């Protein structure tokens, strides 16, 4: 036996242990679910490694998890004969949290137990859940293929440090003993443990066993002798792969528990789909849409993807090749009959079977969402609030399914008068005016900026609906979604408004006449502004505002420029078109000014006002304020 070493926990582990004990007290029994789940994973990993090295079984190929309790000592032990851990593995896995974005996770914690328990559940507490009920945890483990005297003893009271020493252990695998707190001794009761196992572990494909005490010889009711029975390890769960069972035999509760097993989430899934595909490819998939977004959904380093099984043998976690990035929130598994057992991530990358399965699974998920949107709008809104921004990546990523993805998108709109994104493109089309051929939209920094934009004035007057977009991803989305069901999406802040048949002949004639009458004024403004603008025009979109700026059809939009600048990308200079409203008093009075210096000042002031309204900021706000003060003083004399 080697000398004992003491190690300090990683800072994040200390935080997690403290938070878990104080936040998850209302759901203490999850410790057993987490530890049994880990033990089952260890069995799966050994089964996979043994495909290429049968000697790892060491003559014991019957994989199982065993749970026992000692009431007198107040202990619960969870033992598996899975892959086990080396000394380095123990220090790495039981002393640190090897997850990217961990610091960000802790920043999100509020100190409010109910909210934090949800976040901690999403984070995945795993092994550390033992400390919810245990005052001390002892782990004895030996890695498969290693000698008996290369086993490891790990022990901690969860306070800030743990000890590690080398021991001798005849059997491979891991044995975790929980020394229960005095107030948690109920978990040393056999019946309590059995009820938890039945609740949480039926779906696990590895047998979960508990010791069944034998009975002594005794007299029967009629005086006959009932022979003694020996104690034995009794299997407590169905121990079959849930996804291979008939759907009609699986309860909703079993589906939900299986979701929690594979996702390490402890909130229920929103919906799921269990499907067997037969034909050119044969595979089974069980797909879940979570009810809550994981805390690290936007972390670039976050692993995502499905669990991959081949002929019921676990191959890998996070097989991202079967799911496009815009559906990275989907949890679940795929079990293939066509892929080889020695399949690697590299082989999956360019495999025609993989590509066909990815296509089928993508369509399956989109179908799930379409059905949810049709059957339960309220539940779909719950989904959209959690994952809508991720789904918006779809049209740029998946050209083949662009129209289907577009049908699932939701936006705020001038029709609802609410910031809630509840309007689909189909809803919009169903309300289009007679003769309307375009879907009008605006992208701005916020809902209020979009809803109050002067660019909407004429459209509001004509009661034409406009989609209001204000998420950072919306400009990216709209660059890849130019039409839907043969209706062009048209920005109200770019190029001509193009109302087509929505503008009658009299309006067109009046607009042309106004432009003609205002030609001298337009030329004066052009001369005053010089190279600050690409052009100056009489507006066709304003009714109540003196002026606005628009970008050309082929130019980079204001929001795209902001995105590029935020990403540190070089941005070409884009000069706006300045549109003025001659019917507005400020512009009509501008026409009466004979002093060209004053005329230039007023023209510049109107331009900067319009730019401030459009961009929310100015390149040189000090110059604007100086000019504004100068104009105010001049008019106060």
UniProtKB/Swiss-Prot annotation:
SMART domains: HATPase_c. Residues 563-637 are annotated as: C. Coiled coil: none annotated. Pfam families: HATPase_c_3, HSP90. The keyword Aminoacyl-tRNA synthetase does not apply. The keyword ATP-binding applies. Its main location: cytoplasm. Residues 346-562 are annotated as: B. Gene3D superfamilies: 3.30.230.80, 3.40.50.11260, Heat shock protein 90, C-terminal domain (1.20.120.790), Histidine kinase-like ATPase, C-terminal domain (3.30.565.10). InterPro entries: HATPase_C_sf, Heat_shock_protein_90_CS, HSP90_C, Hsp90_fam, Hsp90_N, Ribosomal_Su5_D2-typ_SF. Keywords: ATP-binding, Chaperone, Cytoplasm, Nucleotide-binding, Stress response. GO terms for cellular component: cytoplasm. Residues 1-345 are annotated as: A. It comes from the Bacteria. It is found in: Cytoplasm. HAMAP family: HSP90 (MF_00505). Belongs to the heat shock protein 90 family. Molecular chaperone. Has ATPase activity. Homodimer. This is Chaperone protein HtpG. It comes from Shewanella sp. (strain W3-18-1). The gene is htpG.
